Amino acid sequence: MRFEIISEGKTEKDSIAKFLKSWLDPKLTNPIGIKVTDEMGFARALRKIETKAKAKLEAPGNEQIIGVIGLIDLYGPEYQSHLTTVEQRYRESKELVERAVNDQRFRMHFAVHEVEAWLLCDKGIFPRAVQEIWPASLRPPEEVNFNEPPAKLLDRLYKQATGKTYKKTVNGKELFGKLNSSTAVAACPYLKLMLEDMLAMAKARGL
């Protein structure tokens, strides 16, 4: 049985399935599958999530689907002026999409503020040259926000340390392969929220 994740980019598609499984599988009776669909960018992903989720949940063979998860970066959309905090933006956006899909097998979650935030949990996974210029006063990973979101921070550090840009589909994939999921969950409450949601859905199916 498997989860279907609808994401917005190549980083998610190429990198996060094994990372998420490494946290979930030890807590389940049987290992689960995770299939990630890349919708090529935030705007397209958000526009497509409702129809994609419904199609997956209604397709033949859907009894093998534990649930469909929408996963988009919180960094990207424009928010109404009264939504000023991360919690407000997360909650309002989550509720909006889940109401539209209207299926208990669907959950909407957001990476706060990008999936690269999870990588910031452990500077030891980065090249030594990047570690040597690591910001001493770096905030908790999910507080690295709109001013310089995680991917832009990493791009700046990589350029300064190596003279090369940070490539999401190359460096990101390599780094996620090194990252301990328990370390990331301990440092990222919204990641923990998503994984605990997935764990509860899997256990409800007897896994």
Give residue ranges: language-model regions.
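C-terminal accessory helical subdomains adjacent to catalytic cores in phosphodiester-
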Residues: R2, K13-M40, R47-L207
